[in-house]
């Protein structure tokens, strides 16, 4: 029984499942059919919408097509009008050009006719000229034959005589013209040179203090002399040994004289002695200490002097060793003229003259400042100061133009640049101007007397005067004894004898004057 009940239950379950499956299937079919109906409805709606859009688009396209056709027709009409107008304008222009061409053709035809007439006239004139030339040639030939018959000379001989006469006349005229041009050129060159030198000297003012070979140190009292001498002279010996100078202690009240030909050593001794006097402690150890301090102080003074000189002239970029050598020139003199001051003056003069002539003023100033740099070491190195200075400039990378100007400033080599010539001239101006250099009075008087004696020793000399502080000698000659042509020879002979017998700085101008005076009286 239980088995039957279980079987009945299982049958009922299967029925229920089948019923559920059938219901699901029916629901699925119903949903499918409903969706199909809805989809078909949407498709129909979309088709209707598409047809509506298509019809609307067709209408719009037809409208735009009609508008485009209208616009195209209007554009074609406008272009046709413009083209027709342009054609009309071109046609009018062509008609005007054609008219002008016709007018030009008429003018050309008239000119051609005129040219034909002129050609005919020219041919006639040429024939007439040819006939005249033939007549002239015939007459010329007859004249030459007649001249040859009268003069007894052939045509070639007459030509030769005429050419020789003309050549002599032309040579004479050329000689006169060349001499006039040379005189004018010399006068202009002298005038311009004097003007340039005058301007340079006016714009350059330098003061010079004559240097001596001694320095004087003032003492607070005469007792200090004994302390300077020291026990058994040990202090004075120490000072002289360390500085290389002579210390002169004499009866001069409250003063000690330092003597020496090396200005740097003399300056070191002066500074050291002044410091010792101020300190009051004078003994060999203290003297050695003060001399070392004085040496450092003088070294600083030398560098400062070199820098100030370069700055004053406007020269930059000098090697430090050249700066030191420039500073050493402050303690050097030449004929009583301070060499550093002289170098500054030469640099200024050379630069000013270079500006006036349009030359390189920077090279002229640089070479002028360094031209005597060899004098800073020439007592320590063998050789002339010119060659030493050029070697130093080359060693410390100065330009070839500067080195050449240094080498040429005393004519050791021929100056090849205008800057070298200007440095040479500036050096001569600075050295030769009155007051720049001094000599002993006795030597000065002897030199002037010697100059006049040399001039008077020549035959034909009437008077001789040494002027311009011995830098010029003016000689008056007897006109009956010396001719004008002999003046140049006499001046040269006197110059050569002066060069051989007289020592002098710079140069001496020899002027020989011959004067003839004729006197008569009107009655």
Swiss-Prot record:
Localisation: Cell membrane
Enzyme Commission number, as recorded: 3.1.-.-
Residues in HD domain copies: 339-432
GO biological process, one term: mRNA catabolic process
Class in the EC hierarchy, top level: hydrolase
Transmembrane spans: 14-34
Domain KH as annotated: residue spans: 213-276
GO cellular component: plasma membrane
UniProt entry keywords in alphabetical sequence: Cell membrane, Endonuclease, Hydrolase, Membrane, Nuclease, RNA-binding, Transmembrane, Transmembrane helix
Disulfide bonds: none
Chief localisation class: membrane
Recorded topology in the membrane: Single-pass membrane protein
UniProt cross-references to InterPro entries, sorted A to Z: HD/PDEase_dom, HD_domain, HDIG_dom, KH_dom, KH_dom_type_1, KH_dom_type_1_sf, Ribonuclease_Y, RNase_Y_N
Family that this chain belongs to: Belongs to the RNase Y family.
Functional description taken from the UniProt entry: Endoribonuclease that initiates mRNA decay.
Name of the protein in its database record: Ribonuclease Y
UniProt source species: Caldanaerobacter subterraneus subsp. tengcongensis (strain DSM 15242 / JCM 11007 / NBRC 100824 / MB4)
Gene: rny
